[in-house]
Amino acid sequence: MDKQNVPVITLDGPSASGKGTIARLVSQALGFHYLDSGALYRLVALAAMKRNTDVSDEHSMVDIARHLNVSFRDSSIWLEGKDVSDEVRAEACGEYASRIAQYSALRVELLGYQRDFRKSPGLVTDGRDMGSVIFPDATLKIYLTASEEERALRRHKQLMEKGINASIADLIQALRARDERDSSRSTSPLQQCEDACLLDTTGLSIDQVVSRVLNMYAEARKA
């Protein structure tokens, strides 16, 4: 199958909107490949941290990305042959990832890498510019969001499960700062595409959201 004919579902949205969990489950339901684009920036950030490289050095971040040795195996993420699934989800790693994601040269470097994930029978991907920049011809584009309180509660639950204490108020402030940074960057800012379907997951269970996405995809395939 020609790559351009391979179906793609993109789920974009702010941090802690649930897009990663939903994208992974939808990909499993459809038997599609899965790309966690945010993990790529986290992996670059993690690699920089491990090498004690200054993340404010854009050239160094591009060089790290160019030689990045990563793989996604089921629900685990590997860097240089080591399972870094937990490390890459650490709050510090996420903060650094948000900073380096503003580097236009880095985004260009990772562009082709991400598009190479488009393989038969299909791809489900989540991020912040998947529908607007990486896969503008996607079969279905969804902008996933939720209230600040709901997103903070989800992040709090994730942290508590890892034994990390955090206050809801602090998490809301952190999410606001992250949203501002992601939405105001000059290159590929976080925004809803004109042709993306808005899906507010506030008050919905994971199963309900997955079901809605699958129904939306079925309708998109008919069009």
From Swiss-Prot:
Catalytic activity: CMP + ATP = CDP + ADP; dCMP + ATP = dCDP + ADP
SUPFAM superfamilies tied to this protein: P-loop containing nucleoside triphosphate hydrolases
EC annotation from Swiss-Prot or TrEMBL: 2.7.4.25
Source species, domain of life: Bacteria
Main localization (coarse): cytoplasm
The keyword Lyase belongs to this UniProt entry's keyword annotation: no
GO molecular function: ATP binding; CMP kinase activity; dCMP kinase activity
Keyword Kinase: yes
Species in which this protein is naturally found: Nitrosomonas europaea (strain ATCC 19718 / CIP 103999 / KCTC 2705 / NBRC 14298)
Protein name from the UniProt record: Cytidylate kinase
Gene: cmk
One GO cellular component term noted in the UniProt record for this chain: cytosol
InterPro entries listed in its UniProt record: Cytidylate_kin, Cytidylate_kinase_dom, P-loop_NTPase
Xref: HAMAP family: Cytidyl_kinase_type1
Enzyme category, top tier: transferase
Residues holding ATP: G13, P14, S15, A16, S17, G18, K19, G20, T21
Subcellular location as annotated: Cytoplasm
One Pfam family of this chain: Cytidylate_kin
Cystine pairings recorded for this chain: none
Similarity comment text for this entry: Belongs to the cytidylate kinase family. Type 1 subfamily.
Keywords: ATP-binding, Cytoplasm, Kinase, Nucleotide-binding, Transferase
GO biological processes: nucleobase-containing small molecule interconversion; pyrimidine nucleotide metabolic process
